[in-house]
C-alpha cells in the first residue's frame, strides 16, 4: 500500500504491525511577505507581556528590523517598530516556521534558530495556536 499523509499523522501507531516505511518530503513552502501586516492579523491565543521580534530577511528589506507586539485592554494586538519588552531574535524563515506552527518555539530555541529568554519563550508557546499546519491542494 502506498499513500500520502500529513506531518505528525500517527499512522504507524494506529496499525497493529507498525513496521512501515515512512518518508518525509517537503511539499509546500510558506513565506511571510509582510511581517507587520501578518502579525496584526494573526490569531494569537490570549495576550502576553510586550516583546519584540528582531527579524532578518535578505529578500524583503521591509521585513528587516524590530516588530514589537503589545496588547490593548480588549486583547487586540498592536505591532510597533520599536524595541518594547524582551527581544526575540530570528530570521524570516524561522518566523514563518514558528507562526505556521511547523515547529514550536521551544524546539526552535533548542536548535538555536530562535534566541530569547525563558519567560518570553513560554509566552510564545502559549500565544501561538498549537494546531497542525495543513494545506490540501487536492480539490
Question: How would you label these PLM feature ranges?
Answer:
Residues 1-139:
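Intrinsically disordered, low-complexity, positively biased terminal segments
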